[in-house]
């Protein structure tokens, strides 16, 4: 038989034995269950599935509503200096590190560290705590966007006028274009805009503080339920379904962003808005807060230290060149952030010109941009209903794929702890439904009349930059100084066929830990207690609760170290050495002999063991 025919036979053979059986989770093989082995792990159907899933996961709301405002606030074009320093010194190296760890170990965010360095398994648990808390409150934004989308299907947008039941006598419509003198004469009085009253009085029904939760907002609760149902059905069949959903959710927002960009650039006042966005103020670089904002924005926008990128990477084939795609995805992420600034600030410049105010008076970040500034802007445009629908569909899709990718990362990490149980039959689907239900019930605390205060508390503390910097530091330390960056480069070379440039391992060993440490220290030094809308001050007990949320993830790293040392027998130095030794060589050689390419580090009883046969995989 010719060599080509032999290779085709091997491909057909392995394609058949990896085919899912009816009624089983994807990747479950009958022989695995018969022999009591963990079911076969799923793999991405194609390269584009992985690329779009990662793109959808980390190109999200922060790119559209956070980066442009930070750039404007922190010196315009000058902000790009610390941004790119953190990008190449921290963001890209940690992003690639997490993806390649998942690919190298074929494990999720927790069990990958059990293989790499058991003493640092707390890194995985810290990531899961962060992403679990993030999944509770991030989806609330999508519930708000869903509500606004439904409200947009009206001939007259409900936040355009002051003639509704929720409006107060202080509500003042934008009459600037018709009567500039009327606006000027009333600008000093205590008036509010209809869009602000719609947001605070209709959507949120905002109470006076966090200690007055008030009644449940059933309209928002139903929107939240609908978003959770969509999220569940996007991931319930694993990466095979997720990889297909992102073909729409990850690409359509870019098309709509392009439409909004073109529309914004054609509005009067757009040039002034872009000037405010990019005009460099080098003196702002003397402020440590600028560097803190740059560092935290990088870690937020790249969705690192959450376990999600590790989980997505774990579904790659071993010989997949993820380094190439990680670099391209990094360009896509930062490029989207930069271009979004033109789309947003061109419209804010138009608003400022129409109202006759400085752009600083209309520039907003976060929910203020999405649910106050932009809705107000569309009321000033022709065809306001069309632009409102377009914007909130984009917002919903940007957040939706980020949400279900983060949930997928959480599920993958937890399922990998008990694969024999949770990958069998429909156990995985039931487990996903349980996680979604529990998270939905916890999220109901944020759709009450005082829910906005709870949301801000979670947003400020639970997944704060301090937590992400803490996890990133230990990730780099464990790989560079415990496992060994050169050893890890050997594994990367075995996977992708060449060694990446040395800047990656230098970043893991020195640059990234230094950046994380400096940013971590300055974040604590510059810490300011949380306030809402710069007016409401949170009570002491709420601040304490916020710090408990932050520490709940950070404490995992030292706590797991202590537990592992206590559970291991022998003298302290022997236990320490044992827990610092990678687990994957013996385990892969014995349990998955031949399933992984040969590695010189695979030793069993002090003898090297090569695979006995070859599994042929189709390159992505």
Swiss-Prot record:
What residues are glycosylation sites in this protein?
163, 179, 186, 190
Transmembrane segments in this chain: where? 50-70, 78-97, 122-142, 218-236, 245-262, 298-315, 327-348, 381-400, 430-448, 465-485, 506-525, 545-563
Q: Any ranges marked Extracellular in the topology annotation, and which?
A: 143-217
Catalyses: 4-aminobutanoate(out) + chloride(out) + 2 Na(+)(out) = 4-aminobutanoate(in) + chloride(in) + 2 Na(+)(in); taurine(out) + chloride(out) + 2 Na(+)(out) = taurine(in) + chloride(in) + 2 Na(+)(in); beta-alanine(out) + chloride(out) + 2 Na(+)(out) = beta-alanine(in) + chloride(in) + 2 Na(+)(in); hypotaurine(out) + chloride(out) + 2 Na(+)(out) = hypotaurine(in) + chloride(in) + 2 Na(+)(in)
Basic and acidic residues: which segments have biased composition?
29-42
Maturation and modification? Taurine transport activity is down-regulated upon Ser-322 phosphorylation.
GO molecular function, a single term: taurine:sodium symporter activity
Location of region: Disordered: 15-42
Query: Topological domain, Cytoplasmic: which ranges?
Result: 1-49, 564-620
Check the record and name the Pfam families matching this protein: SNF (PF00209)
Per UniProt, the keywords (alphabetical) are: Cell membrane, Glycoprotein, Membrane, Neurotransmitter transport, Phosphoprotein, Symport, Transmembrane, Transmembrane helix, Transport
What the protein does comes down to: Mediates sodium- and chloride-dependent transport of taurine. Can also mediate transport of beta-alanine, hypotaurine and gamma-aminobutyric acid (GABA).
> Which family is this sequence assigned to?
Belongs to the sodium:neurotransmitter symporter (SNF) (TC 2.A.22) family. SLC6A6 subfamily.
- Name of the protein described by the UniProt record: Sodium- and chloride-dependent taurine transporter
Q: Which organism is it from?
A: Bos taurus (Bovine)
- Please spell out the taxonomic lineage of the organism that makes this protein: Eukaryota, Metazoa, Chordata, Craniata, Vertebrata
